[in-house]
Amino acid sequence: MKDSFSEVKLFQVKPEKTAEFESLILSIAAGQKEQQGCLDIKYVKRFFTFYDSDPHLGDPPRELTKIVKCVKYFSYWELNNKENYGKATKWFFDNYEKELAKLLIAPFDIHCGNSVY
């Protein structure tokens, strides 16, 4: 939605912790949806790559066959404005930062800004 405020997080999950992470994100996402101004929340697990295929030719991505170092997950969180985003982010850190840290190989990355489309 144009004029909303969005965030993308990258989580690099320890391979042996993926089931625990996926269980936790069900709880996190439910709470995120309840935050004031939340328009959307999605989580994606990276299963595919374009390595060895050509997307310019219409080739589909190939499925990943092994885990190297970590399993990557992305979240996309959209809120109606940056003030509600700030409050929601505080809620997220207060409730899940420590629990998530135990499952990751490094702190998660956050990229945020005004939505342009």
Residue ranges: model-predicted function:
Residues 1-3, 39-68, 94-117:
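Glycine-rich beta-strand-turn "strand-cap" elements at beta-sheet edges
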Residues 29-32:
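Hydrophobic C-terminal alpha-helix "anchor/cap" residues
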Residues 27, 91-95:
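A short linear boundary/processing microfeature
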